[in-house]
Amino acid sequence: MVSALLRTILVTGGAGYIGSHTVLQLLQLGFRVVVLDNLDNASELAILRVRELAGHNANNLDFRKVDLRDKQALDQIFSSQRFEAVIHFAGLKAVGESVQKPLLYYDNNLIGTITLLQVMAAHGCTKLVFSSSATVYGWPKEVPCTEESPLCAMNPYGRTKLVIEDMCRDLHASDPNWKIILLRYFNPVGAHPSGYIGEDPCGIPNNLMPFVQQVAVGRRPALTVYGTDYNTKDGTGVRDYIHVVDLADGHIAALRKLYEDSDRIGCEVYNLGTGKGTSVLEMVAAFEKASGKKIPLVFAGRRPGDAEIVYAQTAKAEKELKWKAKYGVEEMCRDLWNWASKNPYGYGSPDSSN
């Protein structure tokens, strides 16, 4: 990779689940990192732990509590130093909440991104890696999902991702100096192997495995499985689960692409998944095996809006980013349990809001 030394990367949402794992990898590679996060759905403790894990590179991390909609604060940060690139994770991400509070999501995710892009443009910073999502595929009629599959977000959260993708495409079309990579994640799972950082959803979890984790540590009595009559191997929904460390690697690969292929990059999109589908019951069984815990199940009807089968075609990322997921479901569940057993209340405590 082009030498990381003296390169400073701005990471928005860097205190969050995927952000914190990516920040750690950047530090370990020798980058300087400035993290911006408003801590709405993240904990500053994640940043403190990333510092500890980074060892002698900890001093290369600078944290600022900032909301991306605060243009004046952003402008001051960009005026104070030069950023080689921006990795943009920041945003609200609970699908269910987005249906109940659409304006909150449009305001936070869209206005925050517009403000960020305006300030980047004003300061001549035109390299961007953006966290998009497989939610932009909606309910795919065919799997695996390729980067050319039809886009049809089914909820306000997914629509914010799709609008931002379009915004990035329009931005590059208007000014080819912009070099942008859009990463469509599938379902992140697991934690850093140290068990020191991991997923800590403030409030109610949004995804399957944090629910499983809460049942395993005694915070919930049972896991509710929604839908047992899908046309799948065991009747439950199938998703493409990917280890968060593999996802972090994908961001490093995207950053490398922005540097090394700068002349050929426009606004590119890549799926980040394993290319394999795993059912809800298969994930539960793998977690039970990894943890030695029995997860009581309650079966319920399908939830409106849940797709039957979603998994990625990953050939483009493998070919162009030289990236491929290394870890399987067993490692995801092993590392998730290592984190959950050491941090049953995430970064909080039993009497905190977590």
Swiss-Prot record:
The active site is at 157 (proton acceptor). NAD(+) binds at residues 8-39. It catalyses: UDP-alpha-D-glucose = UDP-alpha-D-galactose. Keywords: Isomerase, NAD. Its cofactor is NAD(+). GO terms for molecular function: UDP-glucose 4-epimerase activity. GO terms for biological process: galactose metabolic process; monosaccharide metabolic process. InterPro entries: NAD(P)-bd_dom, NAD(P)-bd_dom_sf, UDP_G4E. Catalyzes the interconversion between UDP-glucose and UDP-galactose. This is UDP-glucose 4-epimerase 1. It comes from Oryza sativa subsp. japonica (Rice).
